[in-house]
């Protein structure tokens, strides 16, 4: 199943308002209507435009689609719905709304409608389950991992009358979407508390908390690491094995490097929602060795006499 970017299909920006979305849909519908267009793929493009407007023209579906886009789906590329996105158009009694794609069905089920009349909503019997709010601490490495993160949490149980009867532990494997940031809120549809008397499950809301890293500071998509250097390494140049989120790299330190200098390593930062990675900045820090014995102090004395170096010459200008 391939990902469909409905914004690209209609040719609008993700920030487009309802009026712009409707105008873009009308334009494409007129252009590719099978009774008007002679293009070979007109019918397919007409269906795509209808499907795109079915989603973007409905506030609830658009919000759900925007959540899905956070997982880094790219138009025309293979895609699998993340955990918690249930097909609600099957046995639940959704309305049949047209010839929609597998992608649409995997996200929205069969909840269709008239593009100009608004989508018809399924009415569920019983009482909807309670939403669950959790904070999820993640490490920087997990934002790049393709592995799922297992979480366990308590959800309330209710009887047929909707009265709480206790709690049960629920365990999920959650894929951390690319580009996630501290404080971001992720919704997992239908993964909250179970409904009663046939009602829909509640949702699980995860608030992301980035755990502090012992080596890296974060500046947007970029990472900063402090690289300690001995004075002779900074003066003569060297190669240093520098940690990154996905293994060590050999960093070349040029002669006459200065403390505080930053070296940029492209593509070793954090990923955005499209999977593109920021930079790693290696900030050099010259660390002085202890001069605790006479021979070491003598070497420093000899260096000071030979170098005749004054780091404060600019003060006399």
UniProtKB/Swiss-Prot annotation:
- NCBIfam families given in the database record: PRK10266.1 (NF007618)
What exactly does this protein do? DNA-binding protein that preferentially recognizes a curved DNA sequence. It is probably a functional analog of DnaJ; displays overlapping activities with DnaJ, but functions under different conditions, probably acting as a molecular chaperone in an adaptive response to environmental stresses other than heat shock. Lacks autonomous chaperone activity; binds native substrates and targets them for recognition by DnaK. Its activity is inhibited by the binding of CbpM.
GO biological process terms on file: chaperone cofactor-dependent protein refolding; protein refolding
Q: Which InterPro entries match?
A: DNA-bd_curved-DNA, DnaJ_C, DnaJ_domain, DnaJ_domain_CS, HSP40/DnaJ_pept-bd, J_dom_sf
Designated gene of the protein: cbpA
> Which terms are listed as keywords in the entry?
Chaperone, Cytoplasm, DNA-binding
Main localization (coarse): cytoplasm
Q: Name a GO molecular-function annotation.
A: unfolded protein binding
> Would you tell me the protein name for this molecule?
Curved DNA-binding protein
Q: Which residues form the J domain?
A: 5-69
Q: Which domain of life is it from?
A: Bacteria
Q: Which organism is it from?
A: Pseudomonas putida (strain W619)
Single GO cellular component term: nucleoid
PROSITE patterns attached to this UniProt entry? DNAJ_1 (PS00636), DNAJ_2 (PS50076)
Where does this one sit in the cell? Cytoplasm, Nucleoid
Q: Which Pfam families does the entry mention?
A: DnaJ (PF00226), DnaJ_C (PF01556)
């Amino acid at each position: 199943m391939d990902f469909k970017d409905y914004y690209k299909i209609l040719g609008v920006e993700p920030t487009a308002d309802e009026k712009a979305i409707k105008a873009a849909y009308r334009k494409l519908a007129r252009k590719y209507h099978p009774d008007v267009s002679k293009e070979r793929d007109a019918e397919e493009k007409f269906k795509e435009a209808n499907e795109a407007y079915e989603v973007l023209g409905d506030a609830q579906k658009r919000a759900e689609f925007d959540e899905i886009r956070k997982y880094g789906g790219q138009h025309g590329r293979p895609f699998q719905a993340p955990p918690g996105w249930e097909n609600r158009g099957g046995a639940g009694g959704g309305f049949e709304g047209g010839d929609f794609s597998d992608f649409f069905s995997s996200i929205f089920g069969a909840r269709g409608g008239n593009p100009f009349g608004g989508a018809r909503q399924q009415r569920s019997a019983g009482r909807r389950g309670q939403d669950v709010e959790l904070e999820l601490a993640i490490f920087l490495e997990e934002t790049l991992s393709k592995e799922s993160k297992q979480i366990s949490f308590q959800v309330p149980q209710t009887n047929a009358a909707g009265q709480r009867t206790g709690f049960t532990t629920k365990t999920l494997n959650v894929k951390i979407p690319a580009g996630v940031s501290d404080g971001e809120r992720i919704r997992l549809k239908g993964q909250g508390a179970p409904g009663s008397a046939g009602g829909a499950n509640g949702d699980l809301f995860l608030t992301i908390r980035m755990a502090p890293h012992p080596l890296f500071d974060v500046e947007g998509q970029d990472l900063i690491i402090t690289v300690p250097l001995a004075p002779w390494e900074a003066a003569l140049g060297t190669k240093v094995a520098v940690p990154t989120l996905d293994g060590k790299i050999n960093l070349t330190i040029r002669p006459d490097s200065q403390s505080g200098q930053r070296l940029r390593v492209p593509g070793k930062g954090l990923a955005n929602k499209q999977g593109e990675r920021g930079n790693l900045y290696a900030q050099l820090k010259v660390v002085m060795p202890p001069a605790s014995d006479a021979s070491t102090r003598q070497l420093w004395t000899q260096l000071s006499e030979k170098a005749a170096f004054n780091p404060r010459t600019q003060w006399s200008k």
